[in-house]
From Swiss-Prot:
Family: Belongs to the UPF0276 family.
Name under which the protein is recorded: UPF0276 protein CV_3513
InterPro entries reported in the protein's UniProt record: MbnB/TglH/ChrH, Xyl_isomerase-like_sf
Pfam families associated with the record: MbnB_TglH_ChrH (PF05114)
Superkingdom: Bacteria
Gene3D superfamilies xref list: Divalent-metal-dependent TIM barrel enzymes
Length: 276
């Protein structure tokens, strides 16, 4: 199973305010990504997504499976995701390395997990179960976290690398999340990147953070900050060009603003291609 069939260019996270404009104008968007769960109930949103998938390569990005939870993935959720995959034939499917549920409770958030051998065994089982249910490889995204577990036995990059080795999954590298963790927690981002097998990185995310009470918060509500652009350039120099996405989920701007952000990333990707 290949990691993705996304083109090696920059795309955008396509959100509801832009569906009709995008479908009417058919701009050059590279590729688009949507949140999987928004389409589980079918109806008009799914009909719209089918049209989107006919126009641009599509990535399905999940926020609800919680593969880092102790409880197994919800069977109903997996079944809904499989139906969506079958109906839209996405170029990539991804989830977060986070937890959000127990057998009788669900939290609508992306919560961090401990990077221990015990957690690794649990998550690897859930990833394998998910890939078997979907009949394809998924990408796992690194998380923005605001706490660290004192019993961590490895860093996030080492944990993801082990998941890649055990399950054959890929990595969705969120550069903004990694930068936020560097500032908030003092994460050694060089060590995280060094631990990740470059060939396993199938996609990159870029987004804007907010500052709250001296911390950086991954809100996806602003343009990509200059510091993150510089970090992105470092990452691309290190691993080579990768399909890259501009995420913007709150205070969503005009579509043209997203296209302008994507053009910045594309210029960096193009420069890397010229040097290679």
């Amino acid at each position: 199973m290949s990691l993705t069939t996304l083109p090696g260019v920059c795309g955008i996270g396509l959100r509801a305010p832009h569906y009709r404009e995008a479908l009417d104008a058919r701009p050059e968007l590279g590729w688009v990504e949507v949140h999987s769960e928004n389409f589980f109930d079918g109806g008009t949103p799914l009909a719209m997504l089918r049209r989107v998938a006919e126009c641009w390569p599509l990535s399905l990005h999940g926020v609800g499976l919680g593969l880092g939870s102790a409880a197994r993935p919800d069977r109903g959720h997996l079944a809904s995701l499989r139906r969506l995959v079958d109906e839209t034939c996405p170029a990539a499917v991804s989830e977060h390395l986070s937890f959000n549920h127990s057998p009788h409770r669900y939290v609508n958030d992306l919560l961090p997990i401990p990077y221990t051998r015990a957690a690794l065994d649990t998550v690897a089982g859930h990833v394998s179960e998910t890939q078997d249910a979907l009949g394809r490889t998924i990408l796992l995204e690194n998380l923005s976290s605001y706490v660290e577990f004192p019993d961590n036995e490895m860093n996030e990059g080492e944990f993801l690398a082990e998941l890649v080795r055990i399950t054959g999954c890929g990595v969705l590298l969120d550069v903004n999340n990694l930068y936020v963790n560097r500032i908030n927690l003092g994460t050694d981002t060089d060590a995280v990147l060094a631990a990740l097998p470059p060939d396993a990185i199938g996609e990159i995310h870029l987004a804007g953070y907010s500052e709250r009470e001296g911390m950086l918060v991954d809100t996806h509500s602003q343009a990509v900050h200059d510091e993150v652009w510089r970090f992105y350039r470092e990452v691309i120099r290190r691993i080579g060009p990768r399909p890259t996405l501009i995420e913007w989920d709150l205070d969503i701007p005009p579509l043209a603003t997203l296209q302008a952000e994507a053009a910045k990333a594309q210029a960096i990707l193009g420069g890397a291609d010229e040097r290679s």
